[in-house]
Amino acid sequence: MRKQTKLVAVLSAAALLAMGASMTSFAAGWEKDDSGIWHYYDSDDEMVTGEWKKDGGKWFYLDDDGEMLTDSWVDDEYYVGEDGAMLINTWKKTLADEDMDDPEDDGEAWYYFGSKGKKTQDDDKKIGGKTYYFDENGKMRDGWYEDENGNVYYLGGEDEGWRASGWLWLEAPEEDDVPALGHDNDDDNDVCDEEGWYWFASDGKMYKKADKKKINGKYYFFNEHGQMLYEWINGQRVSGTPSNAIADGNAATPGSSQAENMLYANVVEEGWRADGWYEIDGAEDTDASDDTDWYYFKDGKAKKAKFASDDKVGFSAKDKYRAKIKVSGKWFCFNEIGQMQTGLQYIPQSNGFYYFDENGYMKTGKVANVEEDNDSFTYYFDTKNGKLGKGVTGEKSGYLYWNGKRLEADDDYRIYKLPKGDKEADGYDYYLVNSKGKLQKSDSKEYDVENGNGYTKVKFDFVGKSYKLDETKLSAEMKADASTAKIELYDGDAEYTDFFK
């Protein structure tokens, strides 16, 4: 804002100045001396001193020497302009009265003189539709300001001064300026950026609670210093205190255990609470800042597997968690920190294997070229509700599957065994497959069995017209040599062979 310092025209004295009168005398009135200084004489022809005189609707001041003051303070409360008239309803940028005689002082400040000419001081005042604050000496306040009740305002630059509202990008305040915020720029452990976004309500009060706030229909997160938080945020609640949301990267013990505390807001230019899909770097506090992955957020919280035993992949040498979660009618897989997973995944809650394509969508039916242990296999996933997407176990369209994986011989034929029930005591069914996984059931054909122990060109008996080998006709040696299936995950970090889970 550029304040306009209005110089009023003096109807009597100023008119004489304009006409260049050399010396004008009145029975009672104004008189200009040879030095060009105006004086006022009363009806007794006495020079008036130390008084205000009104002329043409304006007030003028005669000092102790009877000289009309110009561009000067009067009693540290009033100010007369260059024409000598008292300033009324007017801004003036000048030195304080006590500093006027110090030519080296450059500490000018703005003052406002009201309808009676007195400076406004130790108060707030609405001027031209905007609210300003003045200190006990009448100086207009600017920048960060904290009132006696601990409310924090921002009053613009030194030539602005009006109380701000809405969003402002500002340098973080010094602790001395705003003690209520407790922010210390010199403290390396301070959680604020040097600059950031701050929110000021319509009454100018800054929001300074470590919590979320709805602004113009969107939620934003703030720390206890009032600075808006953005991107990853650790919203851990400290015992006995309100929410103490802090920026990511300040957790004492980073790792997956922090996932439940993490929130996400948009980048600093936006900042509102995230909803929907985001492809972003992970949080420092979950040790994932070097990884870029897809996350799905609802109210700022990532959809994720629970950091608990129910979602833990128990057969993995490393702690891994997986959950199958529906998003907008489609199924996706997420780990314990919310990273979307692709490829073959074991879902503990369903006790089964599922496949998620490169875009994260769960697949059903036949899926070829599933990577596993430096090889690729064909899988089949259920298409029926109730088991939708789960890897099929047993016979399917003339092929043999286990947890979705098609069981095949390496070159010739191989005997596989699958459990009959949920307990090992229930026994096994035995099957014969070729290198394409096709089930065999010819009792007249001789088969080269690659997993046999010294026997080839074997004929088998089958149970009726089924694909099951007649186990009563199988030798103990053949049963012992029958292959059991396995599935490898996580680049060989985990191997699944558990029939009875």
Segments from the language model and where they lie:
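Extracellular adhesion/carbohydrate-binding repeat motifs centered on closely spaced tryptophans
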Residues: 2-501
